């Protein structure tokens, strides 16, 4: 009887511990670790860095991830960029997702503290900003001067393509057309 009770208590303790670990927020690499790895890879591979600030609940972030993961668009982007992702803006009650530790500091230092998601910054291999996703007023993004997030409208796509020309000057016209076409087919007018 004592061994059955002991086994039952051990089983309950294991189930309880498993439940606690399943409900705890995940531990993500720190922003410093993500950026150190991205800079190391970018320098070794002679690429720039595409830094993406996103959140699990963000629909446009998922659309941008689909763009980066697409079999046609992804390889073009990967040819020129090492992608670094930092999760920010997660909801405290969400036990399945967490912010990347320390991600708010680089977001703020890159002038994206008030930007929507995704907030995109293209950096050189040393981590120096080249361009970000704040659309210039001259392109008539709505609203002007704001973060484009996922490039879906013609002005947003135009700005994203200008970002690429600045941060990936070796992007060929054929590659640029393929990316622009991909975004235009999945965007909104």
Question: What is the predicted function of each stretch?
Answer:
Residues 70-74, 78-159:
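Thioredoxin-like thiol-disulfide oxidoreductase module
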Residues 136-189:
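Thiol-/selenol-based redox modules, centered on thioredoxin-like
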Residues 1-8:
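Positively charged n-region of N-terminal signal peptides that target proteins for export
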Residues 31-49, 77:
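A short beta-strand-turn-helix
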Residues 22-26:
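Boundary at the C-terminal end of the N-terminal hydrophobic targeting segment
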Residues 53-68:
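Conserved redox-active cysteine motifs that mediate thiol-disulfide chemistry
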Residues 49-51, 58, 83, 120:
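Hydrophobic beta-strand anchors of alpha/beta hydrolase catalytic cores
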């Amino acid at each position: 009887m004592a061994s059955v009770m002991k086994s039952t208590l051990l089983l309950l303790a294991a189930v309880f511990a498993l439940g606690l670990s399943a409900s705890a927020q995940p531990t993500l690499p720190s922003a410093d670790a993500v950026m150190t790895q991205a800079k190391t890879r970018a320098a070794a591979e002679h690429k720039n860095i595409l830094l993406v600030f996103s959140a699990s609940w963000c629909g446009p972030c998922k659309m941008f991830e689909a763009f980066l993961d697409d079999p046609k668009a992804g390889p073009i982007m990967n040819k020129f960029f090492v992608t670094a992702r930092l999760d920010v803006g997660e909801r405290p009650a969400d036990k399945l997702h967490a912010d990347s530790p320390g991600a708010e500091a680089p977001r703020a230092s890159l002038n994206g503290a008030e930007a929507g998601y995704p907030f995109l910054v293209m950096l050189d291999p040393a981590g120096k900003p080249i361009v970000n996703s704040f659309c210039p007023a001259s392109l008539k993004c709505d609203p002007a001067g704001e973060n484009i997030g996922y490039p879906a409208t013609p002005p947003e796509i135009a700005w994203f393509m200008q970002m690429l020309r600045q941060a990936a000057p070796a992007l060929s016209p054929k590659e640029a057309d393929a990316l622009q076409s991909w975004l235009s087919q999945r965007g909104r007018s």
